Curated annotation (Swiss-Prot):
Stretches with biased composition (Basic and acidic residues): 454-466, 652-661, 883-895, 1007-1017, 1024-1034, 1194-1238
Membrane topology, as annotated: Peripheral membrane protein
Top-level taxonomy: Eukaryota, Metazoa, Ecdysozoa, Arthropoda, Hexapoda
Residues with the Phosphoserine modification: S645, S646, S834, S890, S893, S1154
Protein name per UniProt: Receptor-mediated endocytosis protein 6 homolog
This protein's UniProt keywords: Coiled coil, Endocytosis, GTPase activation, Guanine-nucleotide releasing factor, Membrane, Phosphoprotein
Length: 1712
C-alpha cells in the first residue's frame, strides 16, 4: 500500500485538470488584456485626431457665420469636407527628424508653462503685433492643437491655469476689465470662448438647463416675441396687419393691437420664467472648472482693491450669462443642444429672451438669477484646480495634431515675440526660446536677413550646450511664479537656419491676404516674402483670391507630434500573480511588520510635475532595448572621457536649472532610426539610472555626512561627447579577458571621471549634486563604479531601510531616496557589465590605481553634523514641496496598487518592532519604471530598525532582502549578513580624482578631511562592535522546513562579526605574504569573473527556493552576500543557474579536500564561498568605490594605446603610496582588535579558499568544515550548505582548467533577454561546453549526488520540483482516464504521481509533442531525487497554492471588468466626437444652403417654384413638384461644394428640404388654409375634454395592470408635443417613432418580455390624449402625403399604429 501522503492517481488527475483549467483561464485573460490594451492605444490616437477635426470644423462654422456676404460659402464647405478625409502623418516621417524634434521641444515646453504662454498672448494683445484674425488663429492653434480641444482632464487643467495667468496679467491690470471680456477683444475672452465650447461638462449643463424651454419656444408655431411690440407691428405687411388686427383706425383695431402687445409681453415673460426655472433646477450641474475660474477671478479682483463690488458682480455675470448661457440660447442648434432648424423668426424670439435674461441678471438685484450667481461664489474659494477636476483616467493624450500652416504661424509668432524688448520674460527663458526656435528652419530670405542681434545667440548656444553637459539640473531649486517646464532640446541640432522642407511650402507662397499681410511690426522684424509662415487668417476677412491657399492648406496632411505625457499605458497593465499574492499576504502578516515611514506626498499642483511624468516616456519598458539595455559597457568607457567635474555643479546649477537641452532627441533617434543614427549602441544615450527627483528637487540622502542635493537627471543633460569615434577599437578591447601576471596596485579613481556623465547600469547616483557646503566638506566619489554593484531590478531596499533605521534610532544615518535607484528599466538586463566583466572595459587611462589587494577598509560610518542636516523623509523635496515622484512618478497609478489600501495599518512606529514579514511583501514587476511601486511599497519593504535605541549603521543595521519576480535579479551584491550583529565599522576611504585643471588646494583640503574622518571612525569601532542581536526581517513562516531552524538559529549565541573576522584574517595574511605562490591577490579575480560568467543569468533570473535560500553565501565581485531572504519559488529553470554555481563550489571542494578546514560556525551564519575578498564593502549610501574592484584590462596597461602626461602619473604614484600606508594601518588596527577570535582557523580557511585562484578551483568552506568536523552541528551546517544541481553531470560549468570567455560568448550574453515568464527557460550564460573536461568534475558530481540522496538539500529540490510539477500538470491533459492504481505499484516502487507522469510521457511520445516530452521527462527526473513522502508533500503544496491563487483569478476578472469599462468609455467618447463632427457639418451645410438660396439667382428659382406650387391642387402633384425642385438644387450644390461623401449628400438634401419647406410651411401644412386650422382646433378641444376623465386605469383603455407602474409616460408625451417645432415630414415622423419606441422600452422593462401590439395600443391612446399635440389632423395628413408611400418596416408599423390611434380618439365618447 502506498503511504497516504502520496495520494492516489484519481486525485492527481483531478488536480491536473484543475491546474489546466486555471492555466487556460489565465492565458485567455492575459491575451484579452493585450488585445484590449492595444485597442486602447489606437483609440487614443483616433480620439486625438477626431478632436482636432471637430475643433477645426467648428472654427470654420464660426468663420462662415461671421463672414462677409461677399465671400463664397462654398469655400468654407470645401475646407470642412477636406478635414473629413485629412491624412494624419507622423511629423518625424514628413519633416526632417531634427526639425520634428525641435517642434516637439517647443510644444512640450509651452504645454507645461502656462505662465509663459499667457505672457506671450498678453504681450501680443498689448502691442497689437498681430491683427485680430491672426491672433485668433494663434489662439485656435493653442486651444485645438496644444491643448487637444480640451477633451482630456489634463488639458482642461492646463487651459484653466492659462486662463488664471491671463486673469493676473490682463484683467487685473486693466482699468475696465469688462471691456476685455467682449468677443475677440482679448486673449482671455478668446480662450474662454474656446473652453466653454469644448468642455463636455458645459454641454451637459446647457442641455439640462435649456433643452426643455427651448423646445417650448420653438413648438409655438406663430409666436412673435419682442420687448417692444411696436417694432413687431412694423414688420407686418399691410395685408398681415389687416388680417390680424382689422382695418386700421377702427376701435377694434386699437383693442386688437393692445391685446397683441399684452399677449406678446406675457408670452415673453412666461418663456423667460421657464428658462429661469430650468436654470434653477439644473444649477447644481454647473461645471466645477468654470466655477473655480469664476471664484479665482472674484477673489483676485477683490484682493486688488481696485474695483467695486458691483463692478465685480457685473463682470462675473458677463462671464456666466453674456458669454456662456446667452450664446447657447441664441445658437442652440449650432452647439448641438437641439436638433431643430431655427428659423429667422425663432432666432429673433430667442434673442429677445436672451436680452431679458441678461437684464434680470445684471440689473435686478432681487431676481433669481442674481441668487444663482451668489451660489456660484460659495464653497471652496481659491481651491486648487487639481482638486476640483474629475480625476478620470479613461483617456490619456500623448499626441498633438496640427496642420503645417498653423505650425508655421505659431513658430513665427514666438520668433516675433522674442525679438521684441517688450516681451517681459526672464533672460534664460528668452534664450531658451531662441535656442529652440533656432533649431527650427527659416526660409532662405530670412537667413540672409538675420539680424546681428540674433547671431551671438547662435554662437553661444553650442557653448551653453557644452556647459549643460557638465552640470546636473535640479528643477526644484526654488518655486518660482513661472511654472518652468522641462526642455527636451536634443542639443545636437544645427543652430544654423536650415531651409524648410518642401511639404511646408506647397501651395503656400501667396502671402497677400485680406488683412493686409502681417502688419508693420511683423514686416519690420522679419521678411515673409515667399514664406510659408505668414500669419493669415483661416477664413475670416479673406477674399476669394486666396482660394488656392485655403484649398492647398486643407489638403495638406496633418502633422502628429508626440507629447511627453506620462502614464498612458501604465494604468492598464495588470499585476502579476506574485504581486497579487504578496499584497494579500501583507494584510495577513501585518502584525509582524516594522513601522513603515509612509510618505505619499500629494501631487504638486504646479506644472512642474509634468516634467517628472514626461521623462517617463523616455524610460518606459518598451524603450529598454534602446535606452535601458544600451551597451552600458561602451557608455562607461565613453563617459570616462568627460571633462566635466562635480565642482561645476554649483557654478551652473543656478544658471542651467531650467536649461536642460537634454538628449531626448538622441534617445528617440536610437529608438526610431536604429544604428543609422549618431546613437550607435546607446553611446550617446544618457545614463539609464535616472533619479526621479527632478520635478520638485526631491531630496536625496546625506552623502559622506553632508547634506546632498537631489541628484539631477543624467537623462536631462546634454550628452554630446566630443570624443572622436576613433577609439572604438579600444572599446571593443574590453572583450579580451586577460589574466593578471602579478599583483598590481591600480586606482580606479580618475581625474577625468565626473558625476554628471554617462553612468553604468550599476551606478548609484547618490552624489550627483551637492549643496554649497557639501561641495566643500566631502570628497567626490564617482558614480561610475558604485560601492556595491546592484544587479538589474535591485531597488536597493536595504539601503533605504537602513538609512531610515539610522534616523529612527537617533543617529543621523545616510538618507536615501529609494526612487533614485528604483527604476527598473534603467538597468541593462542584457549587458550586465558589473556582473560578468567586472567593468574591466572601462578606459584604463582613467583607472589610475586599481588595487588588487583586498582592502580592509570598512564602510564609512554615518557620522553627520547635526548642524549640517536638513533631515527630510525620502518622500519630501529639498524645497519643502511635495515630491512629485511620490504622487506622480510611478508609472502605475496609485489607485492600481493595493499597497496604498494597507498604508494606514502601519502608521504607529512603536507597535511593530519585531521581525518583519518582508518575504511576502516585496514584489515588483519590470514595468514599474518610475519607482513604480509607490513610496508605501518601497518603504514598507525596507521599514526601519528595531527600537532598541542602538546606533544602526548603514550596512549592518536592521536590513532586509526581498522576494523578486522573474524579471529581476535575485541578489544584491551588498554584504548582507542578516542574522549577525554588526562588525566594527570603519571609514571607507576613497578619493575622487578631479580633472587636472581643477584647483589643487581643493584636493589638499579634501585629503585632510578624509584623514580626519578616518581617525574619528577608528575611535568608534569598539562601540560599534558591541551592537548585537539584529532581528531577521524575513518571515519564513510560509516555508515549513525553515521554522525549526530559524528558531534554533536565534537561540544560539553567535560571535560578533564572524564573516568580517574571517575576511580580516584573510586580508591580514595577504598583507603579510602568507599566501601560496600563485599570486592569489590577483587570482581571486579569475574566480570572480568565471563565477559571474557562469551565473550571470542565474543571478539575473535565478531564484532560490525554500530554506535553501537562507544563509546562502554567494560571492559577487569582492563582496560577501549573506542571503537570509525568502525568494519566490517561481522560475524552476532559473534555479539551475544558481545551482550551477553551487556545483562549482562542490567541485572546487573536491579538489581542496585535503585542506581540512574546520570553521567554527553555527547555523546562523554562512562562510564565504570562492572568490570572497577581505573588503568590507562600503554602504550604498556612500557611493564609494572599493579599492578591491579590479579590472582585468588594467593589467595590460603597457599594451593600451592611451597616453598619460607626467603630472598625472606622478600624482597616481603618490596616491598609491598613501593608499598602501592607510591599508597597512587599518590592517594592524583590526588585527589588534580581533586577536581573540580564532585567527588560526581563519588563516587556514583563507588559505584553503584563496590558495589557487588562477585555477578557479576554490573550496567551499562550509562543505569542508562539514566533512572534517563531524562534531559540528550537522543540521546547522546542512542548513548552510545549499549547493545542488538536479543533474550532477549535466548543465554545470567546471573550471578545473583555465577558463576564458571568448568575445562571442560575452556578446551572446548581451543579446539574451530576461524572460518575464515563469516558465521561461534561461540558458546558461556561459554555455555548457566551456571547460567541462575537468578531471575534478566527476568527483564533484558524485559528491553532489551523495548530498542529494542524503537529503542534505531538501529546500532547493522541493521548491524547484514543485514549480516544474505545476508547469507540467498545467500544460498536459489526459486523453484517457482508463488507469487505476493497483498493487503492482508496490513492486515498481512508483508513487501515483510518478505513474501519472509516466502516463503523460507515453501520451506525449505517442502524440509527438516534443516540448512536453522534455518537460515531463525533467519532472520525472526531479521526482526521482526526492524521498517518497515528499511526493505527497508536493501534491499538498500544489493544492494549497491552488487555493491561494484564487485571489489572483478574482483579480484577473476584476481587471477584465475594468478594461471592458474603459473600452466602452473610449468607444463612447469616440462616438461623441464623431457626433459632434457630424453636427458641425450639418450646421455648416445648413448655413451654406441658407446662403445659397439667398443668392439672387436662386431667389428667382424659388419664387417661380412657389408660384407653380400654388397653382396645383392635387397633393400628389405638389409632392412630385417639390421633390423635383429639391433634387435640382441638390445637384447644383453637390457640384459646387464638392460633396463627395454620401452622408454629406444626404445632409445637404435634408438641409434643402428644411429651408424650402420652412418657407412654404403654411402652404404644405395647411393646403386648405383656415379650413384645416379649424378642423385641428375642433379635434384639440375634443381631446381636451377627454383629458378630464381619462386616466391610465380607465376601463375604456384596458391597460394591463403590470404596465401601470410607468404611467404617465412623460417622455413619450414630450416627443409628441415637440412635433410642432419641426417643419419637415421626416422630422415629425421621427418624433412619433421616438414616442412609440420609448413606450415599448418601458413596457419591456416592466414585464420582462417584448410587448405585443395589444399591449402598446392602449398606452399610446392615453399618451396621445394627455399630450394633445397641436394641429394633429393636419400633421397626420402632411406626413401621409409626403411619406406615406415611402415607409417600410418598423417605421411603417409605428406610423400605422399612430394613425389608428388618432382615428380611435376621434370616435371616443365622454363617458366616465
Amino acid at each position: 500500500m502506498e503511504p497516504p501522503a502520496a495520494g492516489n492517481l484519481l486525485e492527481i488527475m483531478d488536480l491536473a485538470r484543475t491546474l489546466r483549467q486555471e492555466q487556460l483561464f489565465i492565458q485567455q485573460e492575459q491575451a484579452a488584456f493585450a488585445q484590449l490594451t492595444g485597442a486602447f492605444e489606437s483609440n487614443a490616437g483616433t480620439i486625438t485626431k477626431l478632436a482636432f477635426v471637430c475643433a477645426q470644423q467648428r472654427q470654420i462654422l464660426n468663420e462662415l457665420l461671421l463672414a462677409r456676404t461677399d465671400q463664397d460659402p462654398l469655400l468654407f464647405c470645401r475646407r470642412a469636407s477636406a478635414y473629413d478625409s485629412a491624412q494624419f502623418v507622423d511629423a518625424k516621417q514628413l519633416l526632417p527628424y531634427e526639425h520634428a524634434l525641435a517642434y516637439e521641444d517647443l510644444f512640450n515646453y509651452l504645454y507645461n508653462t502656462p505662465y509663459l504662454l499667457a505672457l506671450s498672448l498678453a504681450t501680443a494683445d498689448r502691442l497689437s503685433l498681430l491683427s485680430a484674425s491672426q491672433l485668433g488663429q494663434i489662439i485656435n492653434t493653442i486651444a485645438t492643437g496644444l491643448y487637444g480641444n480640451a477633451i482630456n482632464t489634463k488639458d482642461v487643467e492646463l487651459l484653466l491655469k492659462l486662463l488664471r495667468e491671463l486673469i493676473e496679467i490682463q484683467l487685473l491690470t486693466s482699468e475696465q476689465p469688462r471691456r476685455l471680456l467682449r468677443t475677440n477683444s482679448s486673449s482671455f475672452a478668446r480662450l474662454y470662448q474656446r473652453l466653454v465650447e469644448s468642455l463636455f461638462s458645459a454641454r451637459i449643463f446647457l442641455t439640462a438647463a435649456l433643452h426643455a424651454p427651448l423646445m417650448g419656444v420653438l413648438s409655438e408655431h406663430e409666436i412673435w416675441l419682442d420687448l417692444d411690440p411696436h417694432k413687431l407691428m412694423q414688420t407686418f405687411t399691410p395685408k398681415e396687419r389687416e388680417k390680424r388686427f382689422g382695418r386700421e383706425g377702427d376701435e377694434e383695431y386699437q383693442r386688437n393691437v393692445a391685446r397683441f402687445h399684452a399677449e406678446t409681453l406675457g408670452k415673453l415673460h412666461s418663456h423667460v420664467q421657464e428658462f429661469v426655472k430650468s436654470l434653477q433646477q439644473s444649477w447644481a450641474l454647473f461645471p466645477s472648472s468654470l466655477r473655480w475660474l469664476l471664484q479665482t477671478l472674484s477673489q483676485q479682483l477683490r484682493q486688488s482693491l481696485r474695483h467695486e463690488e458691483q463692478e465685480i458682480r457685473q463682470l462675473l455675470t458677463d462671464l456666466v450669462f453674456t458669454h456662456f448661457i446667452s450664446p447657447a440660447i441664441a445658437s442652440a442648434d449650432l452647439l448641438g443642444i437641439i436638433d431643430v432648424n431655427v428659423s429667422e423668426r425663432m432666432r429673433h424670439n430667442l434673442n429677445q429672451i436672451v436680452k431679458l435674461l441678461q437684464r434680470l441678471a445684471l440689473n435686478d438685484e432681487d431676481s433669481e438669477l442674481v441668487q444663482l450667481m451668489e451660489l456660484l461664489m460659495l464653497g471652496q474659494t481659491g481651491e486648487d484646480v487639481v482638486a476640483i477636476l474629475p480625476q478620470q483616467s479613461d483617456f490619456e493624450r500623448s499626441q498633438l495634431a496640427i496642420n503645417q500652416r498653423e505650425l508655421a504661424q505659431l513658430v513665427e509668432f514666438f520668433r516675433l515675440l522674442t525679438a521684441r524688448d517688450e516681451y517681459d520674460i526672464s533672460v534664460e527663458e528668452r534664450q531658451r526660446l531662441q535656442r529652440i526656435l533656432g533649431r527650427i528652419p527659416k526660409q532662405q530670405v530670412q537667413q540672409q536677413q538675420q539680424t546681428p542681434k540674433d547671431a551671438p545667440d547662435s554662437r553661444e548656444s553650442p557653448e551653453k550646450s557644452k556647459k549643460s553637459n557638465k552640470s546636473l539640473m535640479s528643477l526644484g531649486k526654488a518655486k518660482k511664479k513661472l511654472a518652468k517646464g522641462m526642455s527636451f532640446s536634443s542639443g545636437s541640432s544645427n543652430h544654423n537656419p536650415v531651409p524648410v522642407s518642401e511639404p511646408l511650402t506647397n501651395g503656400q507662397a501667396n502671402t497677400s491676404n485680406g488683412s493686409g499681410g502681417l502688419g508693420a511690426d511683423l514686416e519690420h522684424c522679419s521678411s515673409h516674402s515667399g514664406s510659408n509662415t505668414s500669419l493669415s487668417s483661416c477664413g475670416a476677412n479673406m477674399p476669394t483670391t486666396n482660394d488656392p491657399l485655403d484649398m492647398s492648406t486643407s489638403s495638406d496632411p496633418v502633422l502628429v507630434f508626440s507629447l511627453y505625457n506620462a502614464g498612458a499605458k501604465s494604468k492598464l497593465k495588470p499585476l502579476t500573480e506574485e504581486e497579487v499574492l504578496k499584497m494579500n499576504s501583507i494584510g495577513q502578516d501585518g502584525s509582524n511588520l516594522l513601522p513603515a515611514v509612509v510618505t505619499t506626498a500629494p501631487l504638486a499642483p504646479s506644472s512642474n510635475n509634468d516634467d517628472v511624468s514626461s521623462l517617463e516616456a523616455m524610460r518606459r519598458p518598451q524603450d529598454d532595448a534602446s535606452i535601458g539595455n544600451s551597451d552600458n559597457l561602451e557608455a562607461i568607457s565613453e563617459a570616462a572621457h568627460s571633462v566635466a567635474s562635480s565642482l561645476d555643479l554649483e557654478e551652473q546649477q543656478e544658471r542651467d536649472v531650467h536649461e536642460n537641452e537634454d538628449n531626448l532627441s538622441d534617445m528617440v533617434s536610437a529608438n526610431v532610426s536604429g544604428r543609422g543614427t549618431p546613437n550607435i549602441s546607446g553611446r550617446d544615450t544618457p545614463s539609464s539610472q535616472v533619479t526621479d527627483g527632478d520635478g520638485a528637487g526631491g531630496d536625496l540622502g546625506h552623502h559622506h555626512g553632508v547634506h546632498a542635493r537631489a541628484a539631477a537627471n543624467p537623462q536631462m543633460q546634454k550628452m554630446l561627447l566630443s570624443k572622436a569615434r576613433s577609439d572604438i577599437e579600444d572599446k571593443f578591447c574590453k572583450f579580451e579577458l586577460k589574466k593578471f601576471e602579478g599583483d598590481e596596485n591600480v586606482s580606479i579613481i580618475s581625474d577625468t571621471w565626473s558625476t554628471d556623465v554617462l553612468a553604468s547600469d550599476s551606478e548609484n547616483t547618490l552624489d550627483a549634486t551637492v549643496s554649497e557646503r557639501g561641495d566643500r566638506d566631502r570628497n567626490f566619489s564617482t558614480p561610475l563604479i558604485p560601492s556595491a554593484v546592484v544587479l538589474p531590478g535591485d531597488n536597493n531596499f536595504v539601503v533605504e531601510a537602513l538609512a531610515r533605521a539610522g534616523r529612527v534610532s537617533g543617529v543621523h544615518g545616510p538618507q536615501l531616496d529609494a526612487s533614485d535607484q528604483r527604476s527598473e528599466s534603467n538597468w541593462s538586463t542584457d549587458v550586465l557589465a558589473s556582473d560578468s566583466e567586472k567593468l574591466a572595459e572601462i578606459d584604463t587611462d582613467d583607472n589610475v590605481s586599481i588595487t588588487t589587494k583586498s582592502d580592509t577598509t570598512a564602510p564609512q560610518a554615518a557620522v553627520l553634523d547635526d548642524d549640517d542636516e536638513d533631515e527630510q523623509t525620502p518622500g519630501s523635496s529639498g524645497d519643502g514641496e511635495p515630491d512629485p515622484d511620490r504622487g506622480n512618478g510611478s508609472e502605475r497609478s496609485q489607485e492600481d496598487s493595493a499597497f496604498f489600501d494597507a498604508v494606514n495599518s502601519y502608521e504607529d512606529a512603536n507597535l511593530y518592532h519585531g521581525a518583519s514579514s518582508l518575504a511576502r511583501s516585496s514584489v515588483r514587476t519590470s514595468y514599474h519604471v518610475l519607482g513604480g511601486e509607490s513610496s508605501f511599497q518601497q518603504q514598507y519593504k525596507c521599514s526601519g530598525a528595531d527600537s532598541s535605541g542602538r546606533k544602526t549603521t548603514p550596512l549592518m543595521g536592521t536590513s532586509c532582502m526581498r522576494r523578486q519576480t522573474s524579471a529581476e535579479s535575485s541578489i544584491s551584491n551588498q554584504s548582507l549578513n542578516l542574522e549577525e550583529p554588526p562588525p566594527p565599522m570603519g571609514k571607507h576611504h576613497h578619493h575622487h580624482r578631479e580633472h587636472h585643471h581643477r584647483d589643487y588646494h581643493h584636493h589638499h583640503r579634501e585629503r585632510e578631511r578624509e584623514r580626519e574622518r578616518e581617525r574619528s571612525a577608528l575611535k568608534k569601532k569598539k562601540h560599534q562592535q558591541q551592537e548585537k542581536e539584529h532581528r531577521d526581517l524575513i518571515d519564513f513562516s510560509d516555508c515549513s522546513e525553515d521554522k525549526e531552524e530559524l528558531a534554533r538559529n536565534r537561540d544560539e549565541e553567535q560571535p560578533p562579526g564572524l564573516v568580517q573576522q574571517l575576511l580580516d584574517m584573510i586580508n591580514q595574511d595577504e598583507q603579510t605574504g602568507a599566501v601560496s605562490s600563485s599570486s592569489p591577490n590577483v587570482e581571486h579575480r579569475r574566480i570572480s569573473i568565471e563565477q559571474r560568467s557562469a551565473i550571470i543569468d542565474g543571478r539575473r533570473n535565478g531564484i532560490l527556493a525554500g530554506s535553501m535560500r537562507r544563509h546562502q553565501s554567494l560571492n559577487y565581485e569582492n563582496h560577501e552576500i549573506m542571503l537570509n531572504s525568502m525568494l519566490p519559488k517561481t522560475d524552476d529553470d532559473k534555479q539551475e543557474m544558481l545551482l550551477c554555481v553551487q556545483t562549482q563550489q562542490l567541485q572546487l571542494e573536491e579538489r581542496r579536500g585535503s585542506a581540512g578546514l574546520r570553521p567554527e560556525v553555527d547555523g546562523a551564519s554562512g562562510i564565504a564561498a570562492a572568490g570572497g575578498s577581505g573588503l568590507k564593502p562600503p554602504t550604498k549610501a556612500t557611493g564609494a568605490i572599493p579599492k578591491s574592484i579590479s579590472f582585468d584590462a588594467s593589467a595590460d596597461k603597457d599594451k593600451q594605446t592611451y597616453h598619460r602626461d607626467g603630472e598625472r602619473d606622478r600624482e597616481r604614484d603618490r596616491e598609491r603610496e598613501r593608499d598602501r600606508e592607510r591599508d597597512r594601518e587599518r590592517d594592524r588596527e583590526r588585527d589588534r582588535e580581533r586577536d581573540h577570535h580564532g585567527a588560526g582557523i581563519f588563516n587556514k580557511l583563507r588559505q584553503g579558499i584563496f590558495k589557487n585562484r588562477r585555477g578557479a578551483s576554490a573550496k567551499n568552506a562550509s562543505n569542508s568544515s562539514n566533512q572534517s568536523n563531524p562534531a559540528a552541528s550537522t543540521s546547522s551546517v546542512q542548513a548552510d550548505i545549499r549547493s545542488v544541481s538536479f543533474d550532477p553531470s549535466a548543465g554545470c560549468d567546471n573550471f578545473g582548467t583555465h577558463y576564458c570567455d571568448t568575445s562571442e560568448d560575452i556578446l551572446a550574453k548581451y543579446r539574451r533577454k530576461v524572460s518575464s515568464s515563469s516558465e521561461a527557460t534561461n540558458s546558461d550564460s556561459t554555455g555548457n561546453g566551456h571547460g567541462v573536461g575537468s578531471t575534478g568534475s566527476v568527483g564533484a558530481a558524485a559528491h553532489l549526488h551523495k548530498h542529494m540522496n542524503g537529503g542534505h538539500i531538501p529546500g532547493v529540490v522541493f521548491g524547484c520540483v514543485k514549480q516544474k510539477l505545476r508547469t507540467v500538470l498545467s500544460r498536459t491533459d489526459l486523453h484517457s482516464g482508463d488507469f487505476r492504481q493497483t498493487s503492482t505499484t508496490s513492486t515498481t516502487m512508483a508513487t501515483p504521481l510518478q505513474i501519472y507522469l509516466q502516463i503523460q510521457l507515453a501520451q506525449c511520445i505517442s502524440l509527438q509533442r516534443l516540448p512536453q516530452i522534455s518537460h515531463v521527462a525533467e519532472a520525472l527526473r526531479c521526482l526521482a531525487q526526492l524521498e517518497r513522502p515528499q511526493h505527497g508533500q508536493l501534491l499538498a503544496e500544489l493544492q494549497r497554492d491552488l487555493e491561494r491563487r484564487q485571489s489572483y483569478l478574482q483579480y484577473l476578472m476584476r481587471h477584465r471588468q475594468q478594461l471592458l469599462l474603459r473600452s466602452e468609455q473610449l468607444e463612447q467618447l469616440e462616438a461623441r466626437l464623431r457626433g459632434e463632427a457630424r453636427s458641425s457639418q450639418r450646421c455648416l451645410l445648413q448655413a451654406l444652403v441658407r446662403m445659397y438660396l439667398a443668392w439672387s439667382r436662386q431667389q428667382e428659382k424659388l419664387e417661380q417654384f412657389q408660384a407653380e406650387f400654388a397653382q396645383l391642387r392635387a397633393s400628389d402633384e405638389r409632392v412630385e413638384l417639390t421633390e423635383e425642385f429639391v433634387e435640382s438644387l441638390l445637384q447644383e450644390l453637390r457640384s459646387s461644394a464638392d460633396l463627395q461623401d454620401e452622408w454629406q449628400v444626404d445632409a445637404a438634401r435634408v438641409a434643402i428640404e428644411r429651408m424650402l419647406l420652412e418657407q412654404m410651411y403654411e402652404q404644405v401644412m395647411f393646403p386648405n388654409e383656415d379650413a384645416d386650422v379649424s378642423r385641428d382646433e375642433v379635434l384639440s378641444a375634443h381631446i381636451g375634454k377627454l383629458q378630464r376623465f381619462v386616466h391610465p386605469a380607465h376601463p375604456a383603455l384596458c391597460i394591463a395592470q403590470e404596465y401601470l407602474g410607468e404611467a404617465p409616460w412623460t417622455f413619450a408625451q414630450q416627443q409628441l408635443c415637440h412635433m410642432a417645432a419641426y417643419k419637415t415630414p421626416r422630422e415629425k415622423l421621427q418624433c412619433i417613432i421616438n414616442c412609440i419606441s420609448s413606450i415599448m422600452s418601458l413596457l419591456r422593462m416592466s414585464s420582462g418580455r417584448v410587448p405585443a401590439a395589444d399591449d402598446l395600443l392602449p398606452v399610446l391612446i392615453y399618451v396621445v390624449i394627455m399630450a394633445n399635440p397641436p394641429y394633429l389632423l393636419s400633421t397626420v395628413e402632411y406626413i401621409s402625403c409626403f411619406l406615406g408611400k415611402k415607409l417600410e418596416g418598423e417605421d411603417e408599423f409605428y406610423w400605422t399604429l399612430f394613425g389608428s390611434v388618432v382615428k380611435f380618439i376621434k370616435t371616443m365618447d365622454y363617458l366616465d
